[in-house]
Every structure is written in C-alpha cells, then in structure tokens.
Amino acid sequence: MSSLSRVLRGTFNTCPIRRFSSAATVVSEPTAVTAAISPPQKSLTSLVNGERNPKRIVEKFKKACESERFRTNIAVYDRTVRRLVAAKRLHYVEEILEEQKKYRDMSKEGFAARIISLYGKAGMFENAQKVFEEMPNRDCKRSVLSFNALLSAYRLSKKFDVVEELFNELPGKLSIKPDIVSYNTLIKALCEKDSLPEAVALLDEIENKGLKPDIVTFNTLLLSSYLKGQFELGEEIWAKMVEKNVAIDIRTYNARLLGLANEAKSKELVNLFGELKASGLKPDVFSFNAMIRGSINEGKMDEAEAWYKEIVKHGYRPDKATFALLLPAMCKAGDFESAIELFKETFSKRYLVGQTTLQQLVDELVKGSKREEAEEIVKIAKTNDFLKLKLNLPSQEE
C-alpha cells in the first residue's frame, strides 16, 4: 500500500472520540505548587544540551519533559532530535517523541504539528504520518497548520512524489485550503525532484487561488534555476521579483551571485555585489564564496584569494564550501605552495574543511610530485586535536 493510501485510510478511519495513546498514561498539567518547586527551564535545558551520551540525552530529555515550560522550548526539541539523528540513533528519536503522547499538549494542533515536523527532520515519515492520523483521536483539529507539517515531513524525508499526491488529495478530503506555505513546500519538493518547469508553473496557480508568492517562493525558484544551469530562467524570475516589488533579501542576492559566477560574468557579478552592499544588506560567507567561484571560473586566482581574505575581514569564518573551491583550484593552477599554506591555516584556525576536499589535495600533491608534503598532510589530519580525518596516500604507481 502506498504512503498516500495509508494516510488517506488513516485520515478517514479514525473516530473523533477523545482518546489518548494507550502506550502511556496521560499526565495532568502541573499545579502552581509543583510548578514552583520544579527546576528552572534554563537548568533543564542545560542538563539536556550538556549531555553527550545519546542514551543519557534521552533519559534527561524525558525527565525534563515533565516540566510544562520545558515542553514549550522548541529549540531544545529541535537540537536534541538533530543530535540523535547525527548519532544515528533513530530509535532514540522515536522514544523521546512518542513520549510526548502522554501529555495533553498533544491535543493542541501546534504541538502535534511540531512533533510531525521533528519526525520529518529525522526522515521518519511513517511516524509523522501516524501522528497526523491520530490527531482526531485526541480531539485535535487538523487544519492547514498540521497539513503543512505533514507535507514538510515527507519533503524532508525525500518522498517528493508523496508530497505532490498529498497536496492534490488531502485538502479536498479534509476541507483544508492550502496557503502559501503549502505551495512553497510543494515548490521545494518539485525543485528537489528536478521538476523545475512544474514548480515555476505554480506561480500562476498561486495567484489564481488569490494567494501572493512571497520571498520564499521566489528564492526557491531562483536558486534552483541557477543551480540547474537555467540561467535565463533565473534572470526571468529575478526580473519578475523586481516587477512585483518583492523585498529582496540576502538569499536572493546570493542566488543571483551564484548564477553570475557560474556563467563567469565577472562585470555583472562585481556590479551586483556592489548593489548588495549599497542596499544596506550585509554580504555573508555565501556571498563571498560566490565571488571566489566567479574569480576561479575566470582563472583569476589572485582575485579569488583576495575575496577569501574579505571573509574574515567582514567577521565571518570560511566554511567547507570555501575550501572546496580554493584548494582544488590552487592545485589545478600549479600553486601547491599556496594550497599547503591554506591547508595549514584551516587547522591552525580550526576551520571546518571536508574530508573529500582534503583527499583531493593529497591526490593532487602526489600527482604533482609533492609526496612528502602529501604525507605531512595525511599525518596532520590523523593526529591533530581538532578534526581527525583518515586520508589515503596514493601508492607510487597510481
């Protein structure tokens, strides 16, 4: 049975009777007395955030959830789920989120939608779907809020076809009217499944439904166009934003900077960067990475290195993408000395750099008869006290 069929079946086979999960007894809300003697929310949050052992994180989180105030802390829920996902402990994600069903908060749509979203961030779409199906049993209404959370959960789980199916089927079944957030989620899903033309076509549908495309709508389409090499389409979307007086933000500028960089349009790129600064917005590391990319694409390594220095001058730290651009480009240009110095800087200043990027550096050094230097990099990557990486040293024959 398809995911959509299971959702629809669950949607219409649940009875709207006040019933809570049998997995746990419903916990009543704290009285004024118990609230007064409960640990402060800040200390509970610190206990959870400060723990590093996944099992202990779960234990402390579940204990902290007994506090009503703690259960309103969206950030700590999000952070805890992300940490458990990073540790590949999805069963622990399920444990802490299923624990929430014993609280009456689950009868509030906002709280239920949050749990659906968290399951989505963990890629656990079936659990998200189950929470959505169970909402009527908890006398919890399902409006566009929880509908959007479900769409997002499937998108984050990369079930793009299901997002499209749910968007087309559920609103009519549940008497829900999709809003601009619904459309934005669908557009993101279509872009991520390489259906850019269908995503762009939704602009007309949005307006025909009496809705107004917002900055998220346009930024999604703009970035997807430039990333997929559809430069002219990206320029059309940019022009439409200007025509409709959409308030352009830093992400809009960064998307177009990337598009111009990929096309090696240096003059337009520099002009747009100047326009960005004149607008009152502050360029960020993504802006500078685009400028670095543009310089590299035109073979101007001196300019690329100058833009790199601007990142720190503007109060930012270079990211993995910065080094993924610069290190291979330096090697390609035969400037191994600069590449080695940049590598050393990443570790001395504790900048994050990807393992794939460093492996490329090692490979290029060996090809360039710099085996001794390559060996040093492999050793530093393995023995440093910041970011231990296992790099492979190519054999002499390779």
UniProtKB/Swiss-Prot annotation:
Ranges: PPR repeats: 108-142, 143-173, 179-213, 214-248, 249-283, 284-318, 319-353
Main location: mitochondrion
One CC-aspect GO term: ribonucleoprotein complex
Coiled coil segments of this chain: none
PANTHER family: PENTATRICOPEPTIDE REPEAT-CONTAINING PROTEIN PET309, MITOCHONDRIAL (PTHR47934), SMALL RIBOSOMAL SUBUNIT PROTEIN MS78 (RPPR3A) (PTHR47934:SF26)
NCBIfam families per record: PPR
Name of protein: Small ribosomal subunit protein mS78 (rPPR3a)
Organism this protein belongs to: Arabidopsis thaliana (Mouse-ear cress)
